[in-house]
């Protein structure tokens, strides 16, 4: 039975379909019946299903041909989602959804888009694909909320992770789809059927499957194309829609990164740009190290690599994805370069590299990016993960280098990558020397731009080969050697790098290669080689333990072997007649290196920097050479060299060879040194080469001549007898050769050195008492020649050539040093006295050079050394001490040395042979005569010179005294005068110049060391007393006294010079160890003098080292003080203390060890009463805080902050700046410490810091302190994150207060003085600035972490701030915080919403409109989280305010609040619509004052009303009861304005509802009429207007008699009463209202009405024609306007009130007509217009013009009167509006006359007048008037 019914129903539907003729009918039937018809498919009856199918087939044909027909998609979607529906139904339903959805208007599609997503859940894959295919094009048109929040999101995807994934996958395929792609499936089907036997897979991805687009599988392409493929333009829109969808954050950012990357590579500009911009904006938010993002990128890049799945099944061919196109790859790789994770992901990383370098579709851009990726892997991939990659990367790079030669830049990158790989994985390269060779070869052959990269790569690879052994090392030697001789400079440079780094520093063959390179012509090659060769071995034991230089014999033999080999080959070097094995530069370097090896083997630190330093090591080298010479067998045994060729002899041979060929000072020195240290064996070899030596003595270089002369003297000293005599004679002769000054100079020196050596030997012989008799016969002759030689030398002292004079002086000094001068003591001629005086006179002479003076002083000092009975010793010493000159410091050190030597005489160390004995080893000969005058010298210095009034003398004396103490430390005289010497030094400590002070301090240190224990105690106490009390030596002032030295002016004369020593002394006293002051003085070595040759001779560095060791136990007390002193503003103290620090604190961890102590000291001294200490403490603190873990001193942080805040306000600027510096550093450190990674330490730091920064920092009166505190808080909030949560209740209110406190006060001042409008703009800008301030930024950071645990404490403080907070920023900020809280933690906030509401209420009535708006805005959000009861109370409060309070501020706050609720919490408003919307309705009728903001308020109320009602009419119907109640209340208000507002609202109700029904009509009218009673008040007009509106709208309802509803009569009575009021303005409205009521009710009250109106018209006419009153012009103007208005109103009202009553008309028609006609002739155009309109109404209702009331005579009279006056208007040329209105009156008359057939009443006179006037209008400038006039004229003419 049921299925018969079904079939009947289906038949009926069929029938209806058949009858549907229009599209509209068809659409209606489909909308109604399609869903139920589809449901019938679930029928079990075959017949029913069959019938349905027939119906659907018919339907499909009809629908497909009519694209405009809409389908009931919404209903179908609901049906599709029905879980109970059978699949048969859903399968058909989706067909119609697919057909209907694209036909919908775009807005409707957007509305249904979320439903499509919901419908997808749990459906089969093809249907899901179809739905997504429908959805994607819609995304382009979707509108998303500006602020993304889950509640406002159109797609609520958060709960649908599976749907999101499906959608994202589909979107990815859409983005990958190229434009214009066609899937040729028909061909593929044939293929698949033909090749179904073979299952081999081909490049197409499977048998017979067409090639999908790059990055897609066949299936993906097919589903994107779908049933209706998109055109390229549609596809572009789809892609843009997807990008918009992602932009709107509809899906998690993480999931959509890949989509944006792919979209950014799109071929269409619009898509690529949109995606690019979005990617850039999210760049900082995306975590590129997220494995999910990176794996997706790799998967898309590489496609599905054919790997078998775990089960062993291969991926279906149609599902296999191809790799993406090169264009997409070029976009993916730059993002991989950002990611550390990408570099670690194996094997994808290597697959991408190989694809980019060698893939089939790669290009140079992709290759470049792939190489960058290789660099990225080398830099960031961790050790464990790079291991398996290394060999593959290296293979790839070498393959690229070998095969790809087109792009030099690319090659450069490849080479560079090889270098980087070698530094990461050296073991890969160590065994592969061939690779080095390959790169060296490439360096020879490649383009110049590539060479730099190869050079860099090779330099990086060096480290990989430093462990080579055996054959590998030999191979590398050969390789380096072969490339060292290549023509390309870069090749040689790299070869040097290899030679120096790959081999150890004692590896002879590589050193030899470097020596050859040192002779390279290019600076970059030889410079590097020299740097390596001259790098000195370490001084400490640990370093020296490893053999760092080759042994001297081995190196010599190797060089000799190479030299002899080279002499036989073309590489030898020719210079003039000489042939050398090496070029001069290389040879020079070789001999210097051999000298370094010699020194190293001799056990001293090798140096090749200065000859003087080298000479200091000569005795040690001498011992080694002697040992080497004596054990020649041992050296020969290591190789098969003949025993005669001793290494030393080979060495001297090489030196001689180079010296003969090229020369050179260092070479000369090396030869001289070798011979001098062992003359017995080595000098004898050169006796036959004296001529060659002489040639060297006449060299053009002075130093060369000096060294050659020394060499000559050593050689000559080995001969004796006649040979010696002849050699000396030759020299004497040569000195007289005036043609060559060089020869003279060399001979003079040689003569001096030779005589000196002769005397020294003689002295030794005499001492040893050897056979004097045997030599006696030769002696007299020799003595004679010696004397002769001395006199010859003496004769040159007065030479005009300074060169020869200096040489003579030097020669005499050498003779005097070695023995008594062989000349008379006194008398005439060249005597010792003459010599002394001559030399002494030269010292102060201005003619002499400094060099001459130096030599003269040295020579004078030597005379008593060689001569134990030198007669003029004291004269000489006195002369030296008297020769003081200003600014001759170096000279004073020389004098000091000379005085020391001369004072001790023969016991002086100057008497030794410097080549054989060091100063320390020298012991004076036992038999020498003693000529020690030290007591006398000491006495003269202490009692005369040191207390001289001349500061230069004092300084010189101090230097001499230091020299005496240093050199004669063991002398009993010095030891017995320690106190006097100390006093002398102390007196100099207070000198104004630094050098004197420094010399004195060094002297004091030495004196202390020399005393015994008792001496030391006395010395300490004296020194401390002198320093601390500042007692000074009084200097007598004579006429010659120099008061200020040059540069002394401007220095404090109050002993400021002592400040450094006072500090040192107080430092020692604080340690209870006053004697430490000496140690400090020794360490405080800060004068440059001590670095000079003369200063270094004192050896203070050794003393300092010892002092450092002695001070070590006091480090705990010293370190804090010294640390601070290093930053002292006084340069002297700073340098001294830094010197002490560097000497004592050698271990860098010392500061960390004593961190607490240092910190304590610094904090204490930050507030010292001395500015110097405060400043140094700040600077020290700044330095201390940097880069140190401060976890142990967290408790000290507040103290540091607070103290530095105080110092920031210091009286001294430099201290303030130092404090600022320290604070900035402290801020940075604290921010780092507040990182969540620090755990508990971070939490502790925040806990101690916040109170300090909030209470002390932000509230500080110092601007800089406040700024820094805020800055620090902002940074802490960024880094601390969730750790801020417990502190939020304190932090947030404090920051909110600061928003106002920190605002410039001038803004408040300006705001108070501004106009209302300016104030609003300005305050808005202020609040906006506050909201974007760092404080607000910090607050917003904190808000993220708030929850119920914190709110309890925070809310009361927040409420307090809102109520009592001062300042715009604070109050606005509070409101902003509340808004944030409602979004961050809505549920947690609910219990506190009531409190916050009541607090915000106080803000709503704030005088400042900006605060008011902020609070309203906050309230709008807050109601969302509050309880209903709280919201109701709020709304009642607002209602009360609005109705009862007159102040505008309350009205405004109500409007703002309700508007905010409507906008931000619409659901809340809907729930309370009955309370809110009536108020809104009333509010929107507020009478707006243009000047005030009421217009804005009206708009807000209107918006609230319109947004929340279903159309205004519907809204009024819905809330009619409430609306009437509130308007009644308004009418009963005491406020006139509110009454008027209520009236307007009532009028609006009646207008919009068109007809009110009882009891509402009665209620409204009663209320209005009640309001009418009484006197006139401003706005009362509105009541009248409302009455008119109500009566007009509800006239039919008023006819019925209803209890409690005023009758028409009562209403008219009340209104007419109001028309009698005196107030003209009000009267006009009342008359208009009465007229409207009369017109609506059709009542006849014309008699009463005309009695009111006609006098008004007549009065007006009289006044307007009468004389003007004497009132002011503008008042007159206003009055005239009002009268005009009343006149117009009166005429209009008469027209409206003209009744349909024949009796009344009979009474008044004549009078009224006459009145109008009169006014028509006399009035202005405005009045004419009004009269004409009234006339129109008059004739419209004139019953005379109707047949049944005809009275031809009366009518004729009226018409004549009318025609006479209307001609004026018809002929009014100026105003077309007047002509138009007049024409319409004439037209009406003619029409009425025609209808009533009363033409006879229109007399000929009338017709004539009218025709005449109409004729003038035929030329009217307005065509429509012209035409109408013409028609009317013809009508009239036809009557005649």
From Swiss-Prot:
Q: Which residues are reported to carry the modification Phosphothreonine? A: 831
Q: State the InterPro entries in the record.
A: ARM-like, ARM-type_fold, ARM_ECM29, Ecm29_N, HEAT_ECM29
Domain of life of the source: Eukaryota
- Modified-residue entries (Phosphoserine), positions: 825
Start and stop residues of the HEAT repeats = 28-65, 107-144, 162-206, 327-363, 388-427, 430-467, 470-508, 684-721, 722-760, 784-821, 830-869, 871-908, 932-970, 976-1013, 1014-1051, 1113-1150, 1153-1190, 1195-1232, 1244-1282, 1286-1324, 1349-1387, 1391-1428, 1518-1555, 1559-1596, 1606-1643, 1647-1684, 1780-1823
Cite the residue spans of the region called Disordered: 187-212
Kindly list the places in or outside the cell where this protein is found, as annotated in its UniProt entry: Endoplasmic reticulum; Endoplasmic reticulum-Golgi intermediate compartment; Endosome; Cytoplasm, Cytoskeleton, Microtubule organizing center, Centrosome
Q: What is its main location?
A: endoplasmic reticulum
Role according to the record: Adapter/scaffolding protein that binds to the 26S proteasome, motor proteins and other compartment specific proteins. May couple the proteasome to different compartments including endosome, endoplasmic reticulum and centrosome. May play a role in ERAD and other enhanced proteolysis. Promotes proteasome dissociation under oxidative stress.
Q: Which family does it belong to?
A: Belongs to the ECM29 family.
What is this protein called in UniProt? Answer: Proteasome adapter and scaffold protein ECM29
Provenance organism: Mus musculus
